[in-house]
Amino acid sequence: MGAPFVWALGLLMLQMLLFVAGEQGTQDITDASERGLHMQKLGSGSVQAALAELVALPCLFTLQPRPSAARDAPRIKWTKVRTASGQRQDLPILVAKDNVVRVAKSWQGRVSLPSYPRRRANATLLLGPLRASDSGLYRCQVVRGIEDEQDLVPLEVTGVVFHYRSARDRYALTFAEAQEACRLSSAIIAAPRHLQAAFEDGFDNCDAGWLSDRTVRYPITQSRPGCYGDRSSLPGVRSYGRRNPQELYDVYCFARELGGEVFYVGPARRLTLAGARAQCRRQGAALASVGQLHLAWHEGLDQCDPGWLADGSVRYPIQTPRRRCGGPAPGVRTVYRFANRTGFPSPAERFDAYCFRAHHPTSQHGDLETPSSGDEGEILSAEGPPVRELEPTLEEEEVVTPDFQEPLVSSGEEETLILEEKQESQQTLSPTPGDPMLASWPTGEVWLSTVAPSPSDMGAGTAASSHTEVAPTDPMPRRRGRFKGLNGRYFQQQEPEPGLQGGMEASAQPPTSEAAVNQMEPPLAMAVTEMLGSGQSRSPWADLTNEVDMPGAGSAGGKSSPEPWLWPPTMVPPSISGHSRAPVLELEKAEGPSARPATPDLFWSPLEATVSAPSPAPWEAFPVATSPDLPMMAMLRGPKEWMLPHPTPISTEANRVEAHGEATATAPPSPAAETKVYSLPLSLTPTGQGGEAMPTTPESPRADFRETGETSPAQVNKAEHSSSSPWPSVNRNVAVGFVPTETATEPTGLRGIPGSESGVFDTAESPTSGLQATVDEVQDPWPSVYSKGLDASSPSAPLGSPGVFLVPKVTPNLEPWVATDEGPTVNPMDSTVTPAPSDASGIWEPGSQVFEEAESTTLSPQVALDTSIVTPLTTLEQGDKVGVPAMSTLGSSSSQPHPEPEDQVETQGTSGASVPPHQSSPLGKPAVPPGTPTAASVGESASVSSGEPTVPWDPSSTLLPVTLGIEDFELEVLAGSPGVESFWEEVASGEEPALPGTPMNAGAEEVHSDPCENNPCLHGGTCNANGTMYGCSCDQGFAGENCEIDIDDCLCSPCENGGTCIDEVNGFVCLCLPSYGGSFCEKDTEGCDRGWHKFQGHCYRYFAHRRAWEDAEKDCRRRSGHLTSVHSPEEHSFINSFGHENTWIGLNDRIVERDFQWTDNTGLQFENWRENQPDNFFAGGEDCVVMVAHESGRWNDVPCNYNLPYVCKKGTVLCGPPPAVENASLIGARKAKYNVHATVRYQCNEGFAQHHVATIRCRSNGKWDRPQIVCTKPRRSHRMRRHHHHHQHHHQHHHHKSRKERRKHKKHPTEDWEKDEGNFC
């Protein structure tokens, strides 16, 4: 019975609860029906939207029609009641009733009720474009009669706009680089609406930057000189309009959402960049990007400690400005390397770090490995390694093509660059199928990823597997890159003309954290691809990277070592062993549709490699490399113009010498040294190894690699030759130069080359035709000089590295094969040179000569060795053509038979460039100081260094001038001796005519040009020549190699006492506050009254006795001042330092509620309220403002009847010169200004008597007392007697005279100080 009873009782109670709930619900419906107004509160949390977007704040309600309320339409009111920080606000936005919407002035144009006219029950507010200050709490209130409903809608505006500057310099980003910089900063490039929204919130930045629509703009809220733009003195976003994507500016980025947390890491010992990365990883995070730090700052992060970020920059976020935290405005501060606010700190410097931990882990682009060695090159970009994205389609992007003003190559078609690359996917980008396209890699930084193979892994290679790709043409020249060399010098490199870039094509995929990377700029448009049998890959010119894996650390899987070796950019560990073959160079021509690889990779194999370069000039450029034991460096400097010699045969007394485009560089060997010579001819026919061959076309020449033994003339098969343990004992110094050759021999495949004991071989019998290169390996007992950071004692450390010279191609335009309309046309694939009717004018290329008469010429490679090198000297006439001599090194005494007559010497081929008229090449040997050689020296070796030679210098050495032409380059090559010297020989019938202006003399001479002839120093800088080098002494306000940088002199805040600094050309100007003077505002021209303290042009005094606010203001006015106003954080800190009690200030809203005004009628420019203030808490009103002492002087509104101390503020006080008094003068020196309470004394002139007080005082209001002194002449005795007699005689008539007639003395004249009553009290 118990259980059924319990169940019955439970059911009964449930029915009662349901009945009560139903009654309550019916009552609620009835109440709502009776009210007739019901708000539909969504309660879905905050509304979130991004900056500059539109957002709808919902407000829905229902109306029940009632006869009594038929004419009573609902009144809708939107109000913002709280800010994002939680401070109370009551800002009316709009009011709507009877289809009439009235918007508050500050919200006009930004808010609307889109559905209200049609549906009065839908009061949804449409707000936008959003600003960051729009975040907060909004209230929608609907009133009908006595019915009142309201709902609160929180709004959160996400995203922040920030300015980004490259690590290289101000204005150093193209449009593509700007997009990449923003992406690597966890952001996107900002749109104009983003920048406008940021400006409307007070964003002010005088740096022009890219926006997403390819316009360049910058926001200015306060106009100032240098920042007027297109809006003169008006505030607004300045615009340069739509710009060429290759122009250089900064960028404005937009970061939308953080997606994690940014936290500060401040260990006891500060960190280098590498240490900061490791510290973040240990905490399960990564270094934060710039965009992530800005978002964290936007969300409230405040930390006055500089820390590393992922891009190598050092920054810190400031919410509340304070002393020693970077300025008076909130924001993210940046620590720059140089005084002109450019450059990031060196990775070896120590700072704290800011790490980012994602809520949902995702791949972070920001934390990419960059070298942190002290020998690394400068960080060329502010962002890390960029990921090259596929080009968008033609419909989306504007294709910019350079103008062609001259005919193309002689075949009538443009030569195309075939990029041989291993890749996964492709995308086609071609204007029209079938059209040839001049190929080069797009402008931007290129990152090279390298994986060094182990010597043990260098086995037999396989045929290269590659895809053919064509990259679009770069329409504009590039700027110079800077790379740090072994000796601390910075080497500069500049790209060739568009479409003619040569060098290495780099990986477009950013390396992983394990990869060894360094940024290389500019990109070089030559791709090298090879697959090892073990699966490893290696870049043939790994010296372009800073970080290379340890030798021997590779595995069969091709994985790199987790702890790579760090090498300077101009070095590469040796990777060519005795088991290896040279890279195969391949030239191809492509037409029709083409595409850029999505993720191209670079691979290097000592066995085989495929190299693609622009066909017109395969010898244009290849990387610089040096050996650690003897640096052999090529340095490109500019801008300069050089006068170059014509290639022409001249005679010599020594053995016959021919010049060519091939070069080697060796160190002077000891008697025990061995020399190995390798040759890389570029063939036009298929070659292979053993039974293996790689098919090519006649238009795709290949390169073979031949090795020559030192002691045996017998042929050595490549597969049979080996050398033991080259790593610890062989220092390699490799110089590779390319020269085209032509022979008629049919190819038969790879074979050994007969050699001699001298290590010199004849390549005339080579079955190939193409580019010639030599490689020297010297087993050198000399001690090695290692770069900083390498351990020479480590058995795994490489003891040498190949040295590869960089030979830039210089052309005046995009058509390198045509010099002039009358000049000859040269095809590198033909053996015939067809000159035009003109005489010596023409373009000079390696392996080609121009003659007055048209005749066929056969070019063949020859090798000649001699100790004397003859360099032609030419005098250039107007309109002559000049060329770029290919590099050559010096040989030992040996010779090879030549088919040409004795004593005939030909110069090497050159690259053409026009010389401006009225320029000549001065002759003679320059005086070159030790340590700064500018050409290859015979007999001794030297290295480019900052003023100190590394090896002995012989002033008597013959110099080989190697210079460039109109493109404003200087190529400086230092070579050792002895070595191998090989030249190109011209085989032709008849005698070659001498070129105009070319002396047919013998001997070693050189061309010397004054580098200061055209004064490359800008802005009035002084050029100081030092041989073929120069330096600029810059005037004040300028810096840089050529004084091209205008330093902002205002960065160091030279103006004192609150003066405003304005930067001008070669100087600055200080605008001083009132009462200050001098060029730095250092002179205080006006002072304060006694007991008052001066600060930035005003006087302040703290009164400790307590008064009500109104009485305190009256007391300040009696003292010619007011309760203090505050207009800057500095002024606030100064006032807050007076006392330690709550203090009255002059801010109040006694006239209009919430309309706070200063009593001295100055504008409200600065606010420092406590949290949730002002709140008008008391019912009686809180109309006066007090500084709260225990909260750093923050403001609070309180009732005005409190008795508190106060601070008065007034202007500075000084009196001018004292007023002049007739017949009197001042005692002492006369001053222009007198301090308050100063006293001066008058003295009557001689012969005058003084009456009344002779002193006056400077009053506290800046005015003098009114002078009382009167100076008069004394009466004479006879006049007194005559006057007395006259008085007695007329005494009886005295009463008949008027008062005026009876006056004894005339009224004294009016003093000048009485005429100006306004100057006195």
UniProtKB/Swiss-Prot annotation:
Question: Could you tell me where the Polar residues compositional bias lies?
Answer: 363-373, 722-731, 906-922
Composition-biased stretches (Basic residues): 1275-1308
Indicate, by first and last residue, each region the UniProt record lists as having compositional bias (Basic and acidic residues): 1309-1321
- What sequence ranges are listed for the domain C-type lectin? 1084-1213
Keyword terms = Calcium, Cell adhesion, Disulfide bond, EGF-like domain, Glycoprotein, Hyaluronic acid, Immunoglobulin domain, Lectin, Proteoglycan, Repeat, Secreted, Signal, Sushi
Q: Where do the EGF-like domain residues begin and end?
A: 1008-1044, 1046-1082
- A Gene Ontology biological process annotation? skeletal system development
Q: Which residues form the Link domain?
A: 160-255, 259-357
Descriptive protein name: Neurocan core protein
Which Cys pairs does UniProt list as disulfide-bonded? 59-140, 182-253, 206-227, 280-355, 304-325, 1012-1023, 1017-1032, 1034-1043, 1050-1061, 1055-1070, 1072-1081, 1088-1099, 1116-1208, 1184-1200, 1215-1258, 1244-1271
List the coiled-coil residues. none
